[in-house]
Structure formats: C-alpha cells, structure tokens
C-alpha cells in the first residue's frame, strides 16, 4: 500500500514538478521586478511598462527625440521612462531646464554609466565621468586647451589654414556632385588632432580615413535598437552576435589607435617641452606615479583623448554638413550670407573671428543651423546625485535625466516660426541677438568644454566655404532634410555641387 502511494506521488511529482517550478520561478521574477520598479511616491508619471523591458518597445530609436514629444503632451513637462533597469526622467521647458541644470546643478551633476558605456569606457574620460575625477579631468583639459591656443590667435590661424585645405579639396570637385561628409570630417578632425596628437593628417591618408569611418560607425551604431537592447540584457547580449559587437570592436580599434599615438609620444617625450595634449597628460601622470587613487592614469588618457577626438569632430562637422545643406535648400539666404562676406571681408582676405561682430546675418544663420539641426536632441544625459525634488516630483538618487532640447528649440512661445529655417530668430534691428532658449552646448557646470573652439571653427569654416563657393543641389537630384539617428542627428547621405565664386 505504502509502495503504491509512493509510486503515485512520484508519478504526480514527475508531472507537476517541472511546471510548478517554472510557474513559481516566473511568478517570483515578476514579483521581484514589480517591487524593484515600483515607483516611489510623487515620482513623475509615465507610460505603462512591461516586466523586465519597461518602455523599451514604446520607443522608436530611429526617431526617439520625436517619439517622446507625444509623451510630453500626455504626461507633462516632467515624465518618466523605464528602459530595462534604467530609470529616466525627461525635463521639458526652459524654466525647468534652468532650474535643474543651473539652480540645482549640484543635484544633477553626474553622468549615468549604462552597461554599454561601462563596457567601453567604464567611468573614465571627460564626457561620462563624475565626481572628483571629472572635476580633475575637466580642469586639467581646459588648462591644456588654453595652453595650446584656445581663445588665442595661434589656434585661430591653425583653423584658417585648415579651412584653406578644405576649400582646396572641394575645389578639386570642379563643381560636380560630391558627398561633403568626409571632407568636412577631415578638416574639423585635423584641428583636434593638432591639439591632441600634435599633427594634422592629409585627406588622402588611408589610416586617417579608416579612423574617421570607425568614428562615424560608432556614432550611428550606439543609438540603434540592438545596441540599446544591450543596456537591458547585457548578460545575454554579450554572448550574441550583432551590431553591438561591431560597436565594441570599433571602439577597441579606436583605443588601439590612441595607444599607438601615446607610445609614439613616449619614445621622444621631453617633460620640459610639451608639444600637445598627450605630452601634457604624460607630464601630469608622472606627478602622480605611485598614487593608486589618482585619476591621471593611462586608461583615462586614452578615454579623454577619444572624448576630445569624438566631441571635437562629430558635433562641429555634423553642424557644418547641416549648414551646407540648408544653404543649398535656401539659396536666397545663401546669397545674403555671401553679400555680407563680400561687404565685410571681401574675396582677398581670409575670414577671422575679428569680423564676426560686423557680420550679424552670417552669425544668425550659423545659430539657426544649430537650432534646426538639433544634433544632440535630448542633451547628454545627467544623473541625480542625491534624492531630489523638482517641480513637486520626487527624483531618487541614480535617476537618469534627459533634457528636451528638441522641444526647447522648437518652442512656439520662444521662436516666431519654430519649424521654419529663419535667421531672423537671432536678429533684432539688424543686430545679432542672443537667445536664452538656445542651448546646443547645454548649460551649467557640465556645459560643453569645447564650446569656444566649436564656435570659432563653425564661423571660420562656414564663412570660408561661403566665400569661395555657392552650394546647389545636383541636377535632377532632390535634397531633403531627412536625418540619420545616432549619438548625434546628422543629415542622410547626400550630394552637393560646390560652384566656385567668380
């Protein structure tokens, strides 16, 4: 009898046990996920979330900056999103953005380190570092940039020289259709190369071209849905093939390139004669030898150099590409820019920032390109450093903060014609007018440290190109303002005709 009952129990257990175990495991995981993601009291509202994934499939990563505007309309100027384990809050509107990034900047000063960023950079570099390490790296880099000409005539002359190389390269196209992408990338990148590596590269240099292509590819890949899925399930995705593996491989190659440049510098390094950023950093590292807590170490040198290289190339070159595209699409605006250049500079003199004050229209056009180009649409993310209250909502420590620059730069209460390319937004009585709602370089203590360099580059490169060429659409080709979503928003691949000025 007992044997029969035992056999029956064993048979029932064999049938029930796997299912019960599976259901119990799923129920436990769902309960754990629910408790983990339970919103605290007064947390900003947001859309309904799926277990484990959060709002991942509600976001179209090909146009995420536009998708979130629908949530703004539904949930207001402070709303939340969950992307896997990442809790994010989007801030919209000038008053709230200023409150967070200026008046409460000490509470929003860190950078969030996603699983993808952790894999690539950990907490090193200039862009994604936080706390004392970030303060030390930023202070050192600003000093180094000033020592190598930032804000001085020497660096401006370097930009003018590179602008000549760029105009010569474009002149070789003989007015025929060409894609300006990598010619512009070459020129802009050479400025930061001269600062970091102490040398510029020829536009035909195959090694340099490969470097720029790797940089372009990581810019695009990092914002893709597959790569973002790595941030949700890193422990699974790291074993699977896909674009995220290409991304990691490309960053590894870029790091090897910088390591090679550092090794070259070490061979003939003279502490008494600092040639460039790498030399300056090696000198600073030598002061902290034997200090395990110092932020000045080789991995930070590699990551900081890559940050300078990326930020110093991608943002400015993308803005210039938008500028030429807008000029080809708005020939009447291009003519006004050229008329101002002819009047103030002429054809025989090289453009310089000394002429900027006398060229309000050209300056306004550059600013309008930045507004409409909107290349960093949700700003570089911040992270809440301590439990904080903003606009009556509770933001726990560790929450990712995104600032809605897309809505700000298209706000109808701030701009007369928000969806139209209109340089008059930056003009008043014929003079250039600064706008508080314009912040392509962000604001506060974590604003872009290369803003001054970028403004100089944009003005000199743009005016040099407008001085020498008229940009037009190729015959039988229609230009559009369609964009490619990546870390930045860039124009889709297109061709232009650069007709030399007579």
Swiss-Prot record:
The annotated consequence of residue 342 to N reads: In allele CYP2J2*5; no change in activity
Q: Which PROSITE patterns match?
A: CYTOCHROME_P450
Q: How does it sit in the membrane?
A: Peripheral membrane protein
Outcome of swapping residue 192 to N: In allele CYP2J2*4; significantly reduced metabolism of arachidonic acid only
Instruction: List the Pfam families hit by this protein, alphabetically.
Output: p450 (PF00067)
Write down the chemical reaction(s) this protein catalyses: (5Z,8Z,11Z,14Z)-eicosatetraenoate + reduced [NADPH--hemoprotein reductase] + O2 = 5,6-epoxy-(8Z,11Z,14Z)-eicosatrienoate + oxidized [NADPH--hemoprotein reductase] + H2O + H(+); (5Z,8Z,11Z,14Z)-eicosatetraenoate + reduced [NADPH--hemoprotein reductase] + O2 = (8R,9S)-epoxy-(5Z,11Z,14Z)-eicosatrienoate + oxidized [NADPH--hemoprotein reductase] + H2O + H(+); (5Z,8Z,11Z,14Z)-eicosatetraenoate + reduced [NADPH--hemoprotein reductase] + O2 = (8S,9R)-epoxy-(5Z,11Z,14Z)-eicosatrienoate + oxidized [NADPH--hemoprotein reductase] + H2O + H(+); (5Z,8Z,11Z,14Z)-eicosatetraenoate + reduced [NADPH--hemoprotein reductase] + O2 = (11R,12S)-epoxy-(5Z,8Z,14Z)-eicosatrienoate + oxidized [NADPH--hemoprotein reductase] + H2O + H(+)
Q: In which pathway does it act?
A: Lipid metabolism; arachidonate metabolism
Main location class: endoplasmic reticulum
The outcome of changing residue 404 to Y is:
In allele CYP2J2*6; significantly reduced metabolism of both arachidonic acid and linoleic acid
Regarding tissue, the record states: Highly expressed in heart, present at lower levels in liver, kidney and skeletal muscle (at protein level).
Q: Provide a GO CC annotation, any one.
A: cytoplasm
Q: Which residues form the signal peptide?
A: none
Positions binding heme in this chain are: 448
Q: What does this protein do?
A: A cytochrome P450 monooxygenase involved in the metabolism of polyunsaturated fatty acids (PUFA) in the cardiovascular system. Mechanistically, uses molecular oxygen inserting one oxygen atom into a substrate, and reducing the second into a water molecule, with two electrons provided by NADPH via cytochrome P450 reductase (NADPH--hemoprotein reductase). Catalyzes the epoxidation of double bonds of PUFA. Converts arachidonic acid to four regioisomeric epoxyeicosatrienoic acids (EpETrE), likely playing a major role in the epoxidation of endogenous cardiac arachidonic acid pools.
Per its record, how is this protein called by name? Cytochrome P450 2J2
Species this chain originates from: Homo sapiens
Which gene is the coding source of this polypeptide chain? CYP2J2
């Amino acid at each position: 009898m007992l044997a029969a009952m035992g056999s029956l129990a064993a048979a029932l257990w064999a049938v029930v046990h796997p299912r019960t175990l599976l259901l119990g495991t799923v129920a436990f995981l769902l309960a754990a996920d629910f408790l983990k993601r339970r919103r605290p009291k007064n947390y900003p509202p947001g859309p309904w979330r799926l277990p484990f994934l959060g709002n991942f499939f509600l976001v179209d990563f090909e146009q995420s900056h536009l998708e979130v505007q629908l949530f703004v309309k539904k949930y207001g100027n402070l709303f939340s999103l969950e992307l896997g384990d990442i809790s994010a809050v989007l801030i919209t509107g000038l008053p709230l953005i200023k409150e967070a990034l200026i008046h409460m900047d000490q509470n929003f000063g860190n950078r969030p380190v996603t699983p993808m960023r952790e894999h690539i950079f950990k907490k090193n570099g200039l862009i994604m570092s936080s706390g004392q390490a970030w303060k030390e790296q930023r202070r050192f880099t600003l000093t180094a940039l000033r020592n190598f000409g930032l804000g001085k005539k020497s660096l401006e002359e370097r930009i003018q020289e590179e602008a000549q190389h760029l105009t010569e390269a474009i002149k070789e196209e003989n007015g025929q259709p060409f894609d300006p992408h990598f010619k512009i990338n070459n020129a802009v990148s050479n400025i930061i190369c001269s600062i970091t590596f102490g040398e510029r590269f020829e536009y035909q240099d195959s090694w340099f071209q490969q470097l720029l292509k790797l940089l372009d590819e990581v810019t695009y890949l990092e914002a893709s849905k597959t790569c973002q899925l790595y941030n949700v399930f890193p422990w699974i995705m790291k074993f699977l093939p896909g674009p995220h593996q290409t991304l990691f491989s490309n960053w590894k190659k870029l790091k090897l390139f910088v390591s090679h440049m550092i090794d070259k510098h070490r061979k003939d390094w003279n502490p008494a004669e600092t040639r460039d950023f790498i030399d300056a950093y090696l000198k600073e590292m030598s002061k902290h030898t034997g200090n395990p807590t110092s932020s000045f170490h080789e991995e930070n040198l590699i990551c900081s150099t890559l940050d300078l290289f990326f930020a110093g190339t991608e943002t400015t070159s993308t803005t210039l590409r938008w500028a030429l595209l807008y000029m080809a699409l708005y020939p009447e605006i291009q003519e006004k820019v050229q008329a101002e250049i002819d009047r103030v500079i002429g054809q025989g003199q090289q453009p310089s920032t000394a002429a900027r004050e006398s060229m309000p229209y050209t300056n306004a056009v550059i600013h309008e390109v930045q507004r409409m180009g909107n290349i960093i649409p949700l700003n570089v993310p911040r992270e809440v450093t301590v439990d904080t209250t903003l606009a009556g909502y509770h933001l726990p420590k560790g929450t990712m903060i995104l600032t809605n620059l897309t809505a700000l730069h298209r706000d109808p209460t701030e701009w007369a014609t928000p969806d139209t390319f209109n340089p008059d937004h930056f003009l008043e009585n014929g003079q250039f007018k600064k706008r508080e709602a314009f912040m392509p370089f962000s604001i506060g203590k974590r604003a872009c440290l290369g803003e001054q360099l970028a403004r100089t580059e944009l003005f000199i490169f743009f005016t040099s190109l407008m001085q020498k060429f008229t940009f037009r659409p190729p015959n039988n080709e229609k230009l559009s303002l369609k964009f490619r979503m990546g870390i930045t928003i860039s124009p889709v691949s297109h061709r232009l005709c650069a007709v030399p000025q007579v």
